[in-house]
């Protein structure tokens, strides 16, 4: 880690090191002094022997040196521990600060995510409540509403509506019907192909002769002349099977109802057509009477132009339009004489 630069002032560790170095230098000086004194003592001992005093001095000096060295070592260890403690403390503080910041960021993010979740839940609930509050009519499109209204509205009872309903029912019944191949009681069948003309379901044949009890209907033509008596029998393995299905009850009821409806429609249609025919007949008679009257008036007015006028000139008779007073025989004797001639 890069620590910030400190001011240029003597720190505690630098002062301790200076003192240690000084003490070492002083101990070196003391040792030199001790050596000199020892040498002097040796020389003096040679001159005047005093071994007890010399030993005491040496022991004291040695103790003093050992004490100083021990003190210096203890001080240096304390300084190193203090520096390591301070560095570890600073690093731990930095790490704790970073962890605190991370925890704060995580807490803020969690709060934000929780708020966003709550907002989304609220919006979803509001949308659901709006959808449930809306009625079914609001949800349906306009076209569906219009169709339902048209279905609900009652059709007017009129001959045109009856005609249209009758025609629609006829077309629907014709579409539902299936074209079948009718086979008479005695028929001659000639065909070069063995394909089936009509097959309602899958064709199945058994060895039994009671094929009429099956729920299948199939007509098959072969290139052999076959006469059918109405019974479902095999003729030299070239047969025509005709099976009738049992009509269920509900289909029978439906067919009866449909027949009743068709009969009602037919009667209504006949009545309507009769009324329409009578109206047309009356109208045609009226028009014919008017035309005859107009023809009569035209004949009476055209009689003037059909009169013959005779004029004699150059030995020939000419037919022209009548001139005033030329048709009177008394006034015009020439015309009368010519007519007599």
Curated annotation (Swiss-Prot):
InterPro entries xref list: BG1-like
Region (Disordered): 28-61, 76-138
Compositionally biased tracts (Basic and acidic residues): 52-61, 105-138
Low complexity biased stretches: 76-92
Coiled coil: none
UniProt-annotated location(s): Cell membrane
Any one GO BP annotation for this protein: positive regulation of auxin mediated signaling pathway
GO cellular component, one term: plasma membrane
Keywords, sorted A to Z: Auxin signaling pathway, Cell membrane, Membrane, Transport
Disulfide bonds: none
Role, per record: Involved in auxin transport. Regulator of the auxin signaling pathway.
Family the UniProt entry places it in: Belongs to the BIG GRAIN 1 (BG1) plant protein family.
Protein's name according to its UniProt entry: Protein BIG GRAIN 1-like C
Lineage of origin: Eukaryota, Viridiplantae, Streptophyta, Embryophyta, Tracheophyta
């Amino acid at each position: 880690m890069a620590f910030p630069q400190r001011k240029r002032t003597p720190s505690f560790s630098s002062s301790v090191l200076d003192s240690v170095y000084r003490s070492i230098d002083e101990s070196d000086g003391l040792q030199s002094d001790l050596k000199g004194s020892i040498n002097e003592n040796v020389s003096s001992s040679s001159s005047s022997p005093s071994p007890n005093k010399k030993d005491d001095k040496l022991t004291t000096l040695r103790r003093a040196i050992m004490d100083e060295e021990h003190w210096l070592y203890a001080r240096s260890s304390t300084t190193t521990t203090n520096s390591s403690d301070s560095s570890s403390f600073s690093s731990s503080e930095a790490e704790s600060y970073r962890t605190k910041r991370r925890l704060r960021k995580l807490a803020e993010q969690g709060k934000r995510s929780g708020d966003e979740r709550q907002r989304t839940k609220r919006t979803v609930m509001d949308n659901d409540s709006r959808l449930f509050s809306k009625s079914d009519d609001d949800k349906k499109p306009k076209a569906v509403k219009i169709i339902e209204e048209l279905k609900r509205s009652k059709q007017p009872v009129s001959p045109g509506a009856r005609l249209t309903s009758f025609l629609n029912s006829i077309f629907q019944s014709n579409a539902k019907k299936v074209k079948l191949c009718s086979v008479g009681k005695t028929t001659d069948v000639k065909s070069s192909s063995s394909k089936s003309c009509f097959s309602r379901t899958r064709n199945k044949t058994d060895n039994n002769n009671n094929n009429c009890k099956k729920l299948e209907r199939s007509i098959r033509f072969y290139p052999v002349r076959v006469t059918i008596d109405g019974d479902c029998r095999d003729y030299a393995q070239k047969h025509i099977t005709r099976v009738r299905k049992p009509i269920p009850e509900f289909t029978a009821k439906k067919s009866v109802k449909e027949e009743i409806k068709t009969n009602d429609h037919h009667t209504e249609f006949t009545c309507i057509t009769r009324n329409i025919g009578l109206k047309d007949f009356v109208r045609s008679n009226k028009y014919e009477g008017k035309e005859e009257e107009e023809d009569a008036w035209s004949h009476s007015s055209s009689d003037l132009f059909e009169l013959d006028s005779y004029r004699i000139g150059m030995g020939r008779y000419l037919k022209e339009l009548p001139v005033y007073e030329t048709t009177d025989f008394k006034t015009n004797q020439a015309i009368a004489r010519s007519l007599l001639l």
